[in-house]
Amino acid sequence: MASDINALKYKKVLLKVSGEALMGNKQFGHEYEVIKKIAEDIKEVIDLGLEVAIVVGGGNIYRGINAALVGMDRASADYIGMLATVMNALTLQNVMESLGIYTRVLSAIPMMSVCEPYIRRKAKRHMEKKRVVIFAGGTGNPFCTTDSAAVLRAIEMNCDILLKATQVDGVYDSDPKKNPNAKKYFTISYKDVINNHLQVMDTAAIAVARENKLPIRVFSIKEHGNFARVIQDKGQYTTIGE
């Protein structure tokens, strides 16, 4: 399949996976079969010959903003949330390596005994060698979401596109789980996402993507094989761009 790489529009991609996606039907933590399916979807894209990076959230373990609402110092809460992303990254790495996928975890918060520190040149070199790079620790700064981290890392790695895996198959004008008449956008501009206060990503992340002309594609992680389909312009998704 790697011989088809020249026919693909996107050759270097970053996948954003929320922590909640790793829970499956659980209320907390990880569901192995769900993580295995995600890893299999990633392998399918690697087999196409693409360079792949991942940013993983931590909401299945800890949400800093929620802790701040009940009285914890926001910066401290966010740092704990960053540690949760490292736990998720190591879990995903373990499952991916069990499938024969060469994987490296790079953390914005140095943890030398468990993973590599984030160094841009090293991360790019790993990707050139067709290793999957999982970026953990968010941006390394409080008050920043993992969506912002995903946009920043995608730009730093010179990725062609950012793919955001969610619980729904695209961007809607309201929550389709609550509103059966919600309208789906097949394409939408950065400006309209911001002006319409759509909750697909935080405003800061969308603004940085717009400034750097990074296209974003939103799709459902629930359907097995969707990652490879979406990167080949197939399946259901919404593209955010100019």
UniProtKB/Swiss-Prot annotation:
Domain of life: Bacteria
Catalytic activities: UMP + ATP = UDP + ADP
Keyword Phosphoprotein: no
Subcellular location: Cytoplasm
One annotated Gene Ontology cellular component of this protein: cytoplasm
Transferase recorded as keyword: yes
Pathway(s): Pyrimidine metabolism; CTP biosynthesis via de novo pathway; UDP from UMP (UMPK route): step 1/1
Binding-site list for ATP: K16, V17, S18, G19, G59, R63, T166, Q167, Y172, D175
Main location: cytoplasm
Keywords on record: ATP-binding, Cytoplasm, Kinase, Nucleotide-binding, Pyrimidine biosynthesis, Transferase
Database matches in CDD domains: AAK_UMPK-PyrH-Ec
Record PANTHER family: URIDYLATE KINASE, URIDYLATE KINASE PUMPKIN, CHLOROPLASTIC
Designated name of the protein: Uridylate kinase
